[in-house]
């Protein structure tokens, strides 16, 4: 990989809302194309890039009181597969070879998740999209992202959000929220920083996995993270 890179292999977590654009639900082709463009900018740097996609544009399992949590979570996992397929299509349309691996087997449309195979794809310059979360209910897609980051030996876990970093509170709700430049894992958990859930945080903490939070919509933000120029 080029010498100017801060990280040579990363796991990028994309929330489902990246795929719905101006809409609150479903897949907006323009939004997906925009995400694909950002991803390709990073790929062109020579970084090995794996992606975990969320499913919040279709479903949020944790918010359905009237349904068994496991069932609700499985529905959410299936939502992530739709996002993964849309992103794969957008990337391949721009001539970037991409593989989708699902944690729940769907052999007709994607490879099953096989760690060694995923790593071989990355080494061959393909982008790998991990779908269906971790395959287990009660675990968020953020936790799945942290898990996959460890498994593939990523140098960092990059979480794309609607805001440009970690804040003391949700800046969308409270404009006085303060941006945090650096914070320890334990502080983040204890202060209830909502960037990741506690399970994802503690997985990263136990394995010394750096977490970088950034706003994907900002031009070059992903490239800046990878080159280490973004604070």
Where are the model-predicted features located?
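C-terminal catalytic "cap/lid" subdomain
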Residues: 1-231
């Amino acid at each position: 990989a080029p010498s100017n890179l801060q990280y040579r292999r990363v796991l990028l977590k994309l929330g489902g809302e990246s795929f719905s654009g101006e809409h609150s639900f479903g897949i907006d082709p323009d939004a997906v194309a925009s995400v694909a463009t950002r991803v390709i900018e990073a790929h062109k740097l020579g970084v090995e890039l794996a992606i975990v996609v969320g499913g919040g544009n279709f479903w949020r399992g944790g918010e359905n009181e009237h349904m068994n949590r496991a069932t609700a979570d499985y529905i959410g996992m299936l939502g992530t597969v739709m996002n993964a397929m849309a992103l794969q299509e957008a990337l391949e349309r721009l001539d970037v070879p991409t593989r989708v691996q699902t944690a729940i087997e769907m052999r007709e449309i994607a490879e099953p998740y096989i760690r060694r195979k995923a790593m071989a794809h990355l080494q061959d310059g393909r982008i790998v999209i991990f779908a269906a979360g971790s395959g287990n209910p009660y675990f968020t897609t953020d936790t799945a992202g942290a898990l996959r980051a460890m498994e593939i030996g990523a140098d960092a876990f990059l979480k794309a959000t609607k805001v440009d970093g970690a804040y003391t509170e949700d800046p969308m709700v409270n404009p006085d929220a303060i941006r945090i430049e650096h914070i320890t894992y334990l502080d983040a958990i204890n202060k209830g920083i909502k960037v990741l859930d506690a399970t994802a945080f503690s997985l990263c903490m136990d394995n010394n996995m750096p977490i970088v939070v950034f706003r994907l919509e900002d031009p070059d933000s992903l490239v800046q993270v990878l080159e280490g120029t973004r604070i």
